[in-house]
Amino acid sequence: MSQLSSTLKRYTESARFTDAPFTKSSYGTYTPSSYGTNLAASFLEKEKFGFKPSPPTSYLTRPRTYGPPSILDYDRGRPLLRPDVIGGGKRAESQTRGTERPSGSGLSGGSGFSYGVTTSSVSYLPVSARDQGVTLTQKKSNSQSDLARDFSSLQTSDSYRLDSGNLGRSPMLARTRKELCALQGLYQAASRSEYLADYLENYGRKASAPQVPTPTPPSRAPEVLSPTYRPSGRYSLWEKGKGQALVSSRSSSPGRDTMNSKSAQGLAGLRNLGNTCFMNSILQCLSNTRELRDYCLQRLYLRDLSHSSRAHTALMEEFAKLIQTIWTSSPNDVVSPSEFKTQIQRYAPRFVGYNQQDAQEFLRFLLDGLHNEVNRVIARPKSNTENLDHLPDDEKGRQMWRKYLEREDSRIGDLFVGQLKSSLTCTDCGYCSTVFDPFWDLSLPITKRGYPEVTLMDCMRLFTKEDVLDGDEKPTCCRCRARKRCIKKFSIQRFPKILVLHLKRFSESRIRTSKLTAFVNFPLRDLDLREFASENTNHAVYNLYAVSNHSGTTMGGHYTAYCRSPVTGEWHTFNDSSVSPMSSSQVRTSDAYLLFYELASPPSRM
C-alpha cells in the first residue's frame, strides 16, 4: 500500500481548472484572485473554483503585505472554499462553510487561513481525525513551495491509501488516465525524497493509529554545534535535476541528518522570489563571512538573544536558520529565502514587495537589524554632552569609542563597525575640530572622466583627500565664531575586522541618474591601508573574500556575487539559484559594486 497526502490530491484538483481570474497586486506580482466577479454565481459551483499556481517570478505562497492595517490583505476576514478531503466514507453532497477563525497578521509567514468545523456542518474528515479536532487549511496557491511545506507537516489523519478499490469507488479520483498519470508521477517524485520516506518510516505505511513522538526535554544551555549542524528551520529546498524535483522542507534533528564536512561547503543557491537578486547577492556574501558564519552555525547568537529582553528577535533567528540551511545543504540544492524576506520587510517596510532595490541599502538595513536584536546592551545610558575637545585626538577617539560601546555592543558590530575621524581646520586661525563617528561601510567616489581604469587605492585617496569648504559650504569656526573657509579631511581611526567598500557607481544630478562603468582594479590580497590611518598602526592589511556585482543600467540590472569559500578557499559565482566555480582571475570586473575585505592576521613576532 502506498500512502499519499491529501496535499497531492488538492494539487491535482486545482490543476483541472484554468479559468480562475487573475489580478495585479500593488507590488507588481500577479496573484490569483480568490474572489472573482462570478463568486456568487451558484453555490453548487464551488467544486469548480480552483486556484492557479503562482507565476514563476514569485515563489511566495500568497501575496504578502506588511504594514498598517489599511494595506493588509484584501482577502482578510473572508471565508475560503473548503477543499475536499477523502477519508473513510462517501463525500457529502452538500458543502457548508465552517466557523471562521481570526486570521493572523501574515507576518509569521503563514500562507493559509484556518477554519474550524461547526457542529451543524457536514464534516469531510474521517471519524478518527474529526475526534482529534483536526482543522483544514486552504492555500491560496498550489505552487511547488506549498507542496514543500505540506510534505513537512503531514498528519496521518490527513492522508489516505491509493488502491484499486478506492479508484473505482471514489468520484473524486475518477479522473482521466492523463490526470492519474500526472498524479502518479508527482507522487513518485515526492516519494524519492528522504524526508517523506522518514515520515512514512516514523508513522508507518498502514492506516494505523497515529504515534505521538516523545518530546525531547529542553536543554539547560544552548548547545554549541559544529559547522556541519543541520538546522531545524522550515526553508524549502529545491534540487537541480530532472525537471527540478521537489524536496521537502528541512525539519530534521541535528543528529540524524548531520552532513560530513566535504558536502557542507555553502554552495547552495538562493531562489529569486521576484527581483530579489540584490538580497541574494548580499546574503551569499554574508554567508561566506567566516566569523559571521560560525556565529550562526554554532548558534552562539542564542546566548545574546537569551540575555536580551527585546520581544523582536525573529530577524536574527531567520537569518541564522538561512545560513545554517545554506551550509548544511548539498551543492545541488536551491534554498528559498521567503521566510527571511518576511522578517526583513517587517523590520524595514521599504523592502515590501518585489521592486528592485539597492544592495548597499539592503546591507545597511540588514546589519542594523541584526545588530539591534543581538545588542548586548539592555538599557542604553542617557547621552551626555561631555566636552572632550581638550583631550589629544588619539585619547578623544578612544573615549568616543568607549561611549559608543556603552550603547551599541554586539557581535555584528564587532565584525563590521570601524571608526572614522573627520577634521575641520580653519584657514584663518588654524583651529582644528575633530569628530569621531562609527561606520559600517565606506562609500568611495570614482573618477568620472578621463580615466578608463582606476585603482582601488585611487578611490581611497579621493575619499580621504583634503577638501576645501568655501562659499555656501563654509562651516562656523568655534574660535572665530563666524563662518570661515575650512579644510576637511577624513582618516580611519579604527579599522574593522570586515571592511565593506562601496564603489559609488551611481551618480545623481538634477536631470538624471547615471551609472559609472569604469573598471576599478582592486587587489585580491594584501590591500594595505596604513597610509589612510589617523595614527600609526601595522594592522591594516586586508584580503578580499566577496564581491557584490551589479550589471546593467540605472533603469534595470541584475546582482550577482563572487565569493571565496572560508573552508576551501575556492571562488564561486552565485547567480541566484545557480552556483558555479570560477577562477580568481575572473573576480575583477567593471560590475564590482560592493567589496568585502577581511582583516588579515597580524604578523607573528619572532
Curated annotation (Swiss-Prot):
Q: Which residues bind Zn(2+)?
A: C426, C429, C477, C480
Q: Name one Pfam family in it.
A: UCH
Which region ranges are annotated with the description Necessary for interaction with MDM4? 1-201, 404-504
Residue ranges of every copy of the USP domain listed in the record: 268-600
What GO CC annotations are associated with the protein? cytoplasm; perinuclear region of cytoplasm
> Which SUPFAM superfamilies does the annotation name?
Cysteine proteinases
What transmembrane ranges does the database entry give? Answer: none
Q: Which domain of life is it from?
A: Eukaryota
The reaction(s) this protein catalyses: Thiol-dependent hydrolysis of ester, thioester, amide, peptide and isopeptide bonds formed by the C-terminal Gly of ubiquitin (a 76-residue protein attached to proteins as an intracellular targeting signal)
What does the record say about activity regulation? Cleavage is inhibited by ubiquitin in a dosage-dependent manner. Cleavage is blocked by ubiquitin aldehyde.
Q: Where in the cell is it found?
A: Cytoplasm; Cytoplasm, Perinuclear region
What does UniProt list as catalytic? C277, H558
Asked if the record carries the keyword Ribonucleoprotein, the reply is no
What's the top EC group for this one?
hydrolase
- One biological process term in Gene Ontology: proteolysis
What are this entry's molecular-function GO terms?
Answer: cysteine-type deubiquitinase activity; zinc ion binding
Main location per UniProt?
cytoplasm
The EC number(s) this enzyme carries: 3.4.19.12
Task: Please provide the record's keywords in A-Z order.
Answer: Biological rhythms, Cell cycle, Cytoplasm, Hydrolase, Metal-binding, Myogenesis, Protease, Thiol protease, Ubl conjugation pathway, Zinc, Zinc-finger
Q: Where is this region: Disordered?
A: 53-112, 207-228
Residue ranges the record marks as coiled coil: none
Q: How does it assemble?
A: Homooligomer. Found in trimeric complex with MDM2 and MDM4 and USP2. Interacts with CCND1; the interaction is direct and promotes its stabilization by antagonizing ubiquitin-dependent degradation. Interacts (via N-terminus and C-terminus) with MDM2. Interacts with MDM4 and PER1. Interacts with KCNQ1; counteracts the NEDD4L-specific down-regulation of I(Ks) and restores plasma membrane localization of KCNQ1.
Q: In UniProt terms, what function does this protein have?
A: Hydrolase that deubiquitinates polyubiquitinated target proteins such as MDM2, MDM4 and CCND1. Possesses both ubiquitin-specific peptidase and isopeptidase activities. Deubiquitinates MDM2 without reversing MDM2-mediated p53/TP53 ubiquitination and thus indirectly promotes p53/TP53 degradation and limits p53 activity. Has no deubiquitinase activity against p53/TP53. Prevents MDM2-mediated degradation of MDM4. Plays a role in the G1/S cell-cycle progression in normal and cancer cells. Plays a role in the regulation of myogenic differentiation of embryonic muscle cells.
| Similarity annotation | Belongs to the peptidase C19 family. USP2 subfamily.
Protein name listed in UniProt: Ubiquitin carboxyl-terminal hydrolase 2
Species this protein is from:
Bos taurus (Bovine)
What high-level taxonomic lineage is stated for the organism? Eukaryota, Metazoa, Chordata, Craniata, Vertebrata
Name of the gene: USP2
